[in-house]
Regions:
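FMN-binding flavodoxin-like domain, especially the glycine-rich phosphate-binding loop
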Residues: 2-3, 13-16, 20-37, 42-140
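Aromatic-flanked redox-active Cys/Sec active sites in thiol-based oxidoreductases
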Residues: 7-11
Length: 140
């Protein structure tokens, strides 16, 4: 199964999460590509069986809108029936950005493979383990 782990990271926290997601998917037998949002677009969606997306909360609990947001908006038309998962880090708030993002994906018809993973600031061992499990869940 081909998996693209697509993420944007400003501080390295979401990047660390993305690496753990990729590790979990590889260990479960996936053919994994780790890509930044600058290197992925809607035209790539059909190449992959599953796409976990990672983005931190920005501003008032929103997706990063300079690079990740436009890429994700472009991909939305390809989400119907696609197996995906969501992850990201935050520094304040309660994770509203992730719940809103999940609702958007469900409205687009995406199949959420598992519960989303969010970490406050840098992921700890428990957070990284949750990311590995998220990666593995994409193959089940």
């Amino acid at each position: 199964m081909k998996i693209a782990v697509v993420y944007w990271s400003g501080t390295g926290n979401t990047e660390a999460m993305a690496q753990a997601v990729a590790e979990g998917a590889k260990n479960a037998g996936g053919d994994v590509s780790l890509l930044t949002s600058a290197d992925f677009g809607a035209s790539d969606m059909d190449t992959y069986d599953a796409v976990p997306f990672g983005c931190p909360a920005m501003g008032s609990e929103e997706l990063e809108d300079g690079e990740f947001g436009p890429m994700f908006s472009d991909c939305e038309k390809k989400l119907s029936g696609k197996k995906i998962a969501l992850f990201g880090s935050y520094g304040w708030g309660d994770g509203e950005w992730l719940r809103t993002w999940e609702d958007t994906c469900r409205s687009d018809g995406a199949v959420l493979a598992c519960e989303s993973v969010m970490c406050n600031e840098a992921p700890d061992d428990e957070g990284l383990d949750a990311c590995r499990k998220l990666g593995a869940a994409l193959l089940s």
